Every structure is written in structure tokens, then in C-alpha cells.
Amino acid sequence: MKVIAILTLLLFCSPTHSSFWQFQRRVKHITGRSAFFSYYGYGCYCGLGDKGIPVDDTDRHSPSSPSPYEKLKEFSCQPVLNSYQFHIVNGAVVCGCTLGPGASCHCRLKACECDKQSVHCFKESLPTYEKNFKQFSSQPRCGRHKPWC
């Protein structure tokens, strides 16, 4: 039963990433950690928390914080639905699209680039990753509002 609940959560409650499964593969390959089990619910911004003051660099670089994902939505792109192709060459992510030119390909490439930025930030902040901040977003310490930038 728990497996079904987790899969439902993954499919319907992960609006912060384009193609969750591709994002998961990239995070795992680049950081060695699971996107869902290591980052979802981390701090105040990773996952659906999205409020309060970021607790550390990992949280500050979360895709939920003000990000390129918001720009994608402004251009009528659907980051959750835009699957894309990518390859990892010498540790670097290379985004691709086989659909040819057009809005759909544009959205897919931009979604890939957004994920690329997030994964790169997660990699850079690995030394300061703190296990105590997992599932932290439900804590009252996160507050109710996003900080003003």
C-alpha cells in the first residue's frame, strides 16, 4: 500500500521538475543520491514546501525556489509533462531533442536545461548536505511565506 501511495505522490505531486523520472536519473547519476528520497521535502524549498527561509545551500538551490521553471510556465510550457532526451558525456549533461524545431522541442530543451541547473547545484552543495533537513519542509520553522528577494 505504501508503494502505491509513493508512486501516486511521484506522479501527481511533483510539479517542481520537468519529467520526474528523467530528473531522478540525472540526480542519481551526478550526485549518487535519489531525487525523491534525498531531496524531496529537504529543507523549506525542495518539494512542495516552498516557504520560509532556505536552511542551507542545497535548499537554496532547490528547483522550487524562484527559478527558470517559472519562466517555462510563462511561455506555456508544461515542465512536468515535457520529457526530453539527455546524455551524460564526461560527467556533463548534454540536452537533446529529436522532434526537430518548434515550440514543443523548445519547451523540452528548456526543461532539460532547468533540470541541468538544479542537478549542478545539488552536486555543488553535496559537501553541506545535512540529513537532518530531510522531511524538514513540514516543520513549523519554515514559516508560511516565501522570503522577499
Curated annotation (Swiss-Prot):
Intrachain S-S bonds: 44-142, 77-107, 95-112, 97-105
Any single biological process term in GO: lipid catabolic process
Keyword field: Calcium, Disulfide bond, Metal-binding, Secreted, Signal
Record text on cofactor binding: Binds 1 Ca(2+) ion per subunit.
Coiled-coil residue windows: none
Domain of life of the native organism: Eukaryota
InterPro entries referenced in this protein's UniProt entry, alphabetically: PLipase_A2, PLipase_A2_Asp_AS, PLipase_A2_dom, PLipase_A2_dom_sf
Signal peptide stretch: 1-18
Name this protein carries in UniProt: Putative inactive group IIC secretory phospholipase A2
Species in which this protein is naturally found: Homo sapiens (Human)
